[in-house]
Amino acid sequence: MKTTSLKPAEVDKKWIVIDAEGLVVGRLASIVAMRLRGKHKAAYTPHVDCGDNVIVINAEKVKFTGRKYNQKSYFYHTGYPGGIKERTAKFILEGRFPERVVEKAVERMLPRGPLFRQILGNLRVYKGTEHPHEAQQPQALDVGALNRKNVSA
């Protein structure tokens, strides 16, 4: 039997919506990263973007386990000498763009390769329940029902 290798024209991309309310960030990010790459499909091809389009809503309501909400640090650099800055997860989630926590978690679980930017472009994260992708008729994926540890108590 021959190994199937998909061509870009043969890829069937679906739209998936995930409600992140009460979900653990790392567990959510690993499931989203797998869906974005297409590794859940039998016809996965490493050199072709065969993953689905994923919409994550309620990103400001994600949970951290342990003390990570107060202690986890995110670093960035301003570009100037000595310009390293640090923000906690609490500061980001209570700020203007809480969806960055989910975006960074997923981004750091994807491999840095030729398809990285293209795959990351298939991720849409929104802080509220509203999203502008109703025309694509996304299917809901209940991540909390996949494993009881995905939901924080």
From Swiss-Prot:
This is Large ribosomal subunit protein uL13. Keywords: Ribonucleoprotein, Ribosomal protein. The gene is rplM. It comes from the Bacteria. Part of the 50S ribosomal subunit. GO terms for biological process: negative regulation of translation; translation. Belongs to the universal ribosomal protein uL13 family. It comes from Methylobacterium radiotolerans (strain ATCC 27329 / DSM 1819 / JCM 2831 / NBRC 15690 / NCIMB 10815 / 0-1). Gene3D superfamilies: Ribosomal protein L13.
